[in-house]
């Protein structure tokens, strides 16, 4: 039987650039891989609510500094790290006018990149696929 975990994955845009975060060596999974802003959805929590919480926690931008541009259909992604596990990903695209990011312990670096440059980064599984569903 496959176990599934519901998560949000958010991308922030600033002008023509997309924010990528490098996961720190202190997180449980996908250490030192580049990712969007993500987090596990708690019980009956709405995905959009979790998305905004994660954006504030991971990059320090509050509701006033972000605007929802698009949400995509839920995606199922098989986890290469765990047997019989999949991620149910709820993708969101937000924009911000503020490129100043305040990282918490979950991430060690950030880069504002052009969409086409995502292939140059060692990312969490299917990150490009999730991003392209939002564009």
Predicted regions and their residues:
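A short coil-to-beta-strand element that immediately follows conserved catalytic motifs
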Residues: 62-72
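Conserved Nudix-box catalytic region and its N-terminal flanking loop in Nudix hydrolases
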Residues: 17-57
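Active-site-adjacent beta-strand/loop module that shapes the phosphate/pyrophosphate-binding cleft
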Residues: 5, 14-16, 72-100, 111
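Functional cleft and adjacent loop/helix regions within the main domain
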Residues: 34-37, 43, 79-84, 93, ...
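NUDIX/MutT-family hydrolases
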Residues: 91-93, 102-131
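Conserved N-terminal beta-strand and adjoining loop/helix that marks the start
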Residues: 1-19, 37-40, 93
């Amino acid at each position: 039987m496959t176990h599934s975990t519901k998560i949000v994955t958010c991308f922030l845009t600033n002008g023509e650039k997309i924010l990528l975060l490098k996961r720190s060596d202190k997180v449980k999974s996908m250490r030192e891989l580049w990712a969007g802003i993500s987090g596990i959805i708690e019980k009956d929590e709405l995905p959009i609510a979790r998305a905004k919480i994660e954006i504030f926690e991971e990059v320090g931008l509050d509701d006033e500094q972000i605007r929802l541009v698009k949400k995509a259909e839920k995606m199922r992604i098989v986890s290469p790290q765990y047997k019989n596990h999949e991620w149910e990903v709820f993708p969101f695209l937000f924009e911000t006018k503020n490129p100043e990011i305040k990282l918490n312990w979950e991430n060690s670096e950030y880069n504002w990149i052009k969409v086409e440059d995502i292939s140059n980064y060692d990312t969490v599984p299917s990150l490009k696929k999730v991003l392209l569903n939002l564009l």
